[in-house]
């Protein structure tokens, strides 16, 4: 029996170490070296990334303004002094002094120039004249307070007048003419729908006088009949009439008859007066006279031009409707000034008021007796308007009175 110590089992032989190949770096120091290299590379990468982010948010000019960048002078602990350049001709700026006597303040100098010591007693300098500045007061003259007071009074006056006298349309004007016919049968109440205009009033006057001459001769009339009057009644009116009140509707914008009628329709649809205006031409057949009335005096054209235009019409009427005694038609411009002051809606009422004055006394100029004050003048007109509106309440709508 064999003992354990003398066992016959074989183990692998251990090869002997080669003494000719020495070990340079052991495993543990090598790992430490790799870690140091990795940390150094990571630190360099972080620095590069940080600088890149700084360059993204700051331009090169911003980096130059930093005290640690691009400085050629040696760094000192004193902060750089910022000096403001001042033009040489200007006097030195006066620096306010505190209550306690401080050290003398150095004068402001140009950059890169040593500041000169401030003299203890500077010579007196003449004050420089200030440069004139263009302000609102220089550009626009000051408006006296009285002007604002007058403007306020004018506005208040206009409101009072507009409340006194309303705007008259063609309907109320025609009713007023019908009422005047009951007072003065020689007046023919010509329709105002559609009214005459500055472009066709001459033709309408000539046509009416030709129809009157035909009626007196017993001939049929050639002109168009009124809308709201029978043929027999119209012939009776023409036979007995001695005065034609031709109301004209005027607007400064249209330049033709068609445009005028279109503008009239548009304003009627809107229910607005706009810039429209009523004019009156009285054809006094008995006195052989044309009387023109414009409450705004020269709203349509200068009175001299209108007078020449009416004189041309008068020559035509002398041929169309000659007088037995050979008397010619004369022309008169009634208004010598603006009658309709401080009011934009009373033109129709003023035309009716002037016609009423003319019917009462055609040879007396009632415009000379008008009050100077516009409010008092329109108060008198308001009394006439109220009387007319009360008188025409019982008249039928759009119907001629029987002649």
Curated annotation (Swiss-Prot):
Keywords: Hydrolase, Membrane, Protease, Secreted, Thiol protease, Transmembrane, Transmembrane helix, Ubl conjugation pathway, Virulence
Membrane topology reported for the UniProt record: Single-pass membrane protein
Gene3D superfamilies per the UniProt record, alphabetical: Adenoviral Proteinase, Chain A
The protein's name: Deubiquitinase and deneddylase Dub1
Family: Belongs to the peptidase C48 family.
Superkingdom of origin organism: Bacteria
Disulfide bonds: none
Pfam families, per database record: Peptidase_C48
Cross-referenced InterPro entries: Papain-like_cys_pep_sf (IPR038765), Peptidase_C48_C (IPR003653)
Polar residues: bias regions: 1-11
Single GO MF annotation: deNEDDylase activity
Cell location: Secreted; Host cell; Membrane
Function statement: Effector proteins function to alter host cell physiology and promote bacterial survival in host tissues. This protease possesses deubiquitinating and deneddylating activities.
EC assignment: 3.4.22.-
Biased composition annotated in UniProt, kind: Pro residues: 86-105, 114-130
TM spans (from-to): 40-60
An individual GO BP term: protein deubiquitination
Ranges for region Disordered: 1-24, 77-132
């Amino acid at each position: 029996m064999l003992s354990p110590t003398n066992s016959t089992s074989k183990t692998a032989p251990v090869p002997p170490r080669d003494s000719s190949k020495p070990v340079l770096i052991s495993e543990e120091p090598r790992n430490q070296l790799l870690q140091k290299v990795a940390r150094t590379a990571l630190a360099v990468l972080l620095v590069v990334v940080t600088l890149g982010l700084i360059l993204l948010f700051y331009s090169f000019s911003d980096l130059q303004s930093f005290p640690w960048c691009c400085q050629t002078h040696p760094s000192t602990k004193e902060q750089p002094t910022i000096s403001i350049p001042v033009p040489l001709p200007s006097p030195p700026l006066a620096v306010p002094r505190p209550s306690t006597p401080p050290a003398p303040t150095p004068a402001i100098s140009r950059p890169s120039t040593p500041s000169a010591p401030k003299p203890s007693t500077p010579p007196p300098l003449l004050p420089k004249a200030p440069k004139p500045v263009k302000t609102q007061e220089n550009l626009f003259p000051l408006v006296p307070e009285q002007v604002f007071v007058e403007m306020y009074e004018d506005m208040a006056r206009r409101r009072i007048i507009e409340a006194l006298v309303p705007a008259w349309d063609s309907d109320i004007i025609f009713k007023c003419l019908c009422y005047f016919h009951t007072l003065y049968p020689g007046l023919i109440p010509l329709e105002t729908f559609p009214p005459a205009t500055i472009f066709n009033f001459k033709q309408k006057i000539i046509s009416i006088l030709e129809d009157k001459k035909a009626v007196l001769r017993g001939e049929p009339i050639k002109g168009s009949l009124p809308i709201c009057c029978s043929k027999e009644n119209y012939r009776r009116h023409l036979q007995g009439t001695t005065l034609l009140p031709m109301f004209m509707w005027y607007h400064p914008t249209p330049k033709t008859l068609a445009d005028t009628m279109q503008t009239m329709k548009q304003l009627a649809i809107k229910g607005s007066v706009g810039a429209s205006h009523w004019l009156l031409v009285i054809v006094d057949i008995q006195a052989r006279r044309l009387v023109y009335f414009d409450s705004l005096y020269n709203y349509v054209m200068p009175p001299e031009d209108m007078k020449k235009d009416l004189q041309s019409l008068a020559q035509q009427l002398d041929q169309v409707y000659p007088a037995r005694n050979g008397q010619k038609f004369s022309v008169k411009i009634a208004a010598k000034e603006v009658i309709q002051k401080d009011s934009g809606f009373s033109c129709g009422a003023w035309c009716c008021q002037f016609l009423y004055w003319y019917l009462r006394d055609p040879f007396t100029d009632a415009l000379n007796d008008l009050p100077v004050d516009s409010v008092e003048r329109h108060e008198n007109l308001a009394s006439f308007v109220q009387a007319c509106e009360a008188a025409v309440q019982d008249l039928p709508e759009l119907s001629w009175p029987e002649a």
